[in-house]
Each structure stands twice: as structure tokens, then as C-alpha cells.
Amino acid sequence: MVELLGIIRIRGWAKAPWYINETLNMLRLRYNFNTMVYPKTSQILGMLNKVSPYITWGEIDPDTLKLLIINRLETVKGDKVSDSYVKEVLKIENIDAMVKQLYEGKIYLHKLDEYFKLPIRLHPPRGGFKGSVKRPYKNKGEFGYRGDKINELMRRMV
């Protein structure tokens, strides 16, 4: 079973050094409130640590991933993702089976460019951020690693 990381960009590009913007572009997080789902690897973790003042991330659970796919993921044509679309293009029975295969490591969401519009665009969080986006999560802020609390934030942003 593969651990999946949900990564959300929470700060803009102005006054960010070029190497931060370049790394965020590699992660496909070009704009505020864009999110991507990646498997937990040492390469990804190194990139996340480099750009941590501009993003927040943590381990995403299957329920939140399913909610994200159903409500915010779009097809290439701009339509919402449905069970019939997943069955037609990916040859997978439904969205539940797709989430299961994502967690088994058989398919990777970030490599499905020809079927979905990536990155996934989110709303700002309902109720606003609970802390400052200029402080780390551990010190009553918002940026950086937050573990499984990323699910709570993503549910407020869907």
C-alpha cells in the first residue's frame, strides 16, 4: 500500500526566489490553492522541504481523495468526473476502484494528464485559515507538514 501526499499551494509567487518558483512548477503548483496528489518518495519529500514556506502537505486518506476526485477533478473537456468516464478511459469499474488502485500504486494521479485537468483547483478554505500563512503549522501557522490534518483542510476547500 502506497502512502499518498496531498500538497496544497497556499502562498503566491511574488517575492519568491526563482528556485522556489521552479520547484513549485515541477510539482505543478503554479497558482494559489492548486493541489496535487503524489506518492510519498524521498525525491518528493526533498522538493517539499525546499518549498515548505509556500505549501502545506500531509497524508491524504481515501475518503478525502474520493471527495476530491468527485467534486473538483475535471476531465480534459471540463466536465466532472463520473463512474462512466472512469470506466470508459481508464478501464476501471468506478471511482471507488480508482481510489483503491491509486493506493495500491497501480496508477498515479499525476501521470493521468491525457484524461484529467491537472492540477486540481480548490477554493480558499471555508472559514479562512486558522493561523497565519507566514508561520509553520507547528507554531500556530499554516505552511509546512501537517500530517493527517491535511484532510480537514482539504474538506474545507472542496
UniProtKB/Swiss-Prot annotation:
Entry's CDD domains?
Answer: Ribosomal_L7_archeal_euk (cd01657)
What biological process terms from GO does the record include?
maturation of LSU-rRNA from tricistronic rRNA transcript (SSU-rRNA, 5.8S rRNA, LSU-rRNA); translation
Q: Which domain of life is it from?
A: Archaea
**Gene3D superfamilies noted in UniProt:** 1.10.15.30, Ribosomal protein L30, ferredoxin-like fold domain
Q: Name one Pfam family in it.
A: Ribosomal_L30
GO CC term, one of those recorded: cytosolic large ribosomal subunit
List keywords of the entry alphabetically.
Ribonucleoprotein, Ribosomal protein
GO MF term (any one): structural constituent of ribosome
Question: What HAMAP family does this protein map onto?
Answer: Ribosomal_uL30_A
Q: Which family does it belong to?
A: Belongs to the universal ribosomal protein uL30 family.
Q: How does it assemble?
A: Part of the 50S ribosomal subunit.
Query: Would you tell me the protein name for this molecule?
Result: Large ribosomal subunit protein uL30
Please tell me the species this chain comes from: Saccharolobus solfataricus (strain ATCC 35092 / DSM 1617 / JCM 11322 / P2) (Sulfolobus solfataricus)
